[in-house]
């Protein structure tokens, strides 16, 4: 069972009574066939639920109102089977607060050249009925998603499925609670921001809990529960001699297990699905949570270090979007560079907290090593290399008057040499279009040093996310050129300034 099983998407057919009851019966029959086929064959993440035809303003308003108040409804897919005068949709669209996708399709794929007549033409009017619907969306300044293609087309299925992921993610985000254990890393700017503005824009709430509250729960964990979790560690990872039974760091592994169980219990009791820590606020904890954070991210929790609540929330959002897709999604940080005459690389990592969902198939190593900051005992952590292939890194920043999402497309590459003295998980990548352009553009646009790294999602996913939440998107990819990139930032400043 996944988060998508908690939601459904309503399939709404737009028509009118102009064409008579027989035409509406055929429309209904077509709609039933399409919905049943999509549910059975399209591999959509959510179930489609067919709703009654929308043929009058009152019917349409009723459907939209019901969608707003149904917690299971993640959004609406609308198909304009016949012509549906768009003034009928104004009241409904005015009150609708769920994501909307217009499926610009028709029942038949090919025209019946020998038999086509005006009855057929009146029944199958997506081509211009869809344009009428598009106009009212533009007139109302309500941007919605559009997918064009026959309902049996696999590309259309994939695009609808991708939109469904966004719709469910948006509903989940409205209920998302982010727990900050302690505050920001002192004097750091980009990890701070306006939590009230974020809750208004995205729906997630951010609040702080004292580390002492967490410590109370951590200390209440039983030895039996710790032993059972360590058994799981033994079967899931390759433990170094120091971490094994009778190893000189075995107690550190037991302490890490206690922290993991305590953190998970605290998060579950509070209904949190994202959290932050900071190495400057660990009073009462024996070590900086490393292994615990890695495993909680693997279970779907959002996380970021140093109190970075925006990245923690973004990680949770992107994990929901990517549920069930190939590839992983993790907290990440651009750590250091490898300059090599145009073959420049970025080594990404963090102090400890990289999610195992992005690891290669090889079992991660569980090790205990010193950590030079935090002033605590040596923390346990998982060490691994990352899968190779196309990926993205994304950063959400607060510019004061708006939120900006930065996305850089990258290519993850194999590590050319062993890293015997680097005791943390890491990823090595080529930034697109090249490191010079990508880093300069990122810096000019104010991108954070913390990011969300994902093999599972792509630029189109993040573009749709930005559109759904009406936030600025700044893209750095193979098409990026710095002069035009700077121009776009200036234009965005004017555009978003006009919306204040």
Swiss-Prot record:
GO biological process: L-arabinose catabolic process to xylulose 5-phosphate
Pathway(s): Carbohydrate degradation; L-arabinose degradation via L-ribulose; D-xylulose 5-phosphate from L-arabinose (bacterial route): step 1/3
EC number(s) per entry: 5.3.1.4
Cofactor(s) annotated in UniProt: Mn(2+)
InterPro entries: Ara_Isoase_C, AraA_central, AraA_N, AraA_N_sf, Fuc/Ara_isomerase_C, Fucose_isomerase_N/cen_sf, Lara_isomerase
Cited function: Catalyzes the conversion of L-arabinose to L-ribulose.
Name the UniProt record assigns to this protein: L-arabinose isomerase
Lineage: Bacteria, Pseudomonadati, Pseudomonadota, Gammaproteobacteria, Enterobacterales
Gene that encodes it: araA
């Amino acid at each position: 069972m996944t988060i998508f099983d908690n939601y459904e998407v309503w399939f709404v057919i737009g028509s009118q009574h102009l064409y008579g009851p027989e035409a509406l019966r055929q429309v209904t029959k077509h709609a039933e066939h399409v919905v049943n086929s999509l549910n059975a064959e399209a591999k959509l993440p959510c179930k489609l639920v067919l709703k009654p035809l929308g043929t009058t303003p009152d019917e349409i308003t009723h459907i939209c109102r019901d969608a707003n108040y149904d917690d299971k409804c993640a959004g609406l897919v609308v198909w304009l089977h016949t012509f549906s005068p768009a003034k009928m949709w104004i009241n409904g669209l005015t009150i609708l607060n769920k994501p909307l996708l217009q499926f610009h399709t028709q029942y038949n794929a090919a025209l019946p050249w020998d038999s086509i007549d005006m009855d057929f033409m009146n029944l199958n009017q997506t081509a211009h009925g869809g344009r009428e619907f598009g106009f009212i969306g533009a007139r109302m300044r309500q941007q919605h998603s559009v997918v064009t293609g026959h309902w049996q087309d696999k590309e259309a299925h994939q695009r609808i499925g991708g939109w469904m992921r966004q719709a469910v993610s948006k509903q989940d985000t409205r209920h998302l609670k982010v727990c900050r254990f302690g505050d920001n890393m002192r004097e750091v700017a980009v990890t701070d921001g306006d939590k009230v503005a974020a809750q208004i824009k995205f729906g997630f709430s951010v609040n702080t809990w004292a580390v002492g509250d967490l410590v109370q729960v951590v200390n209440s964990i039983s030895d039996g529960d710790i032993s059972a979790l360590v058994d799981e560690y033994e079967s899931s990872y390759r433990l170094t001699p120091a971490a094994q039974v009778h190893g000189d760091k075995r107690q550190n592994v037991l302490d890490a297990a206690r922290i993991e169980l305590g953190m998970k219990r605290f998060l579950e009791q509070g209904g949190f699905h994202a959290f932050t820590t900071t190495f400057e606020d660990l009073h009462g904890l024996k070590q900086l949570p490393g292994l615990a954070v890695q495993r909680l991210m693997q279970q779907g929790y959002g996380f970021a270090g140093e109190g970075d609540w925006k990245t923690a929330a973004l990680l949770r959002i992107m994990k929901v979007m990517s549920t069930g897709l190939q590839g992983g999604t993790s907290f990440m940080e651009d750590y250091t560079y490898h300059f090599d005459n145009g073959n420049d690389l970025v080594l990404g990592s963090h102090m400890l907290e990289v999610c195992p969902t992005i690891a290669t198939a090889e079992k991660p190593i569980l090790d205990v090593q010193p950590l030079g900051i935090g002033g605590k005992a040596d923390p346990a952590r998982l060490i691994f290399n990352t899968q190779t292939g196309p990926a993205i890194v994304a950063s959400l920043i607060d510019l004061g008057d708006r939120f900006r999402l930065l996305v850089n497309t990258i290519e993850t590459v194999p590590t050319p040499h062993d890293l015997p003295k680097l005791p943390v998980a890491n990823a090595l990548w080529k930034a697109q279009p090249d490191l010079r352009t990508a880093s300069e553009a990122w810096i000019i646009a104010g991108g954070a040093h913390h990011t969300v790294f994902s093999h599972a999602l792509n630029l189109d996913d993040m573009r749709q996310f930005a559109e759904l939440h009406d936030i600025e998107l700044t893209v750095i990819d193979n098409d990026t050129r710095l002069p035009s990139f700077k121009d776009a930032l200036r234009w965005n400043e004017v555009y978003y300034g006009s919306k204040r």
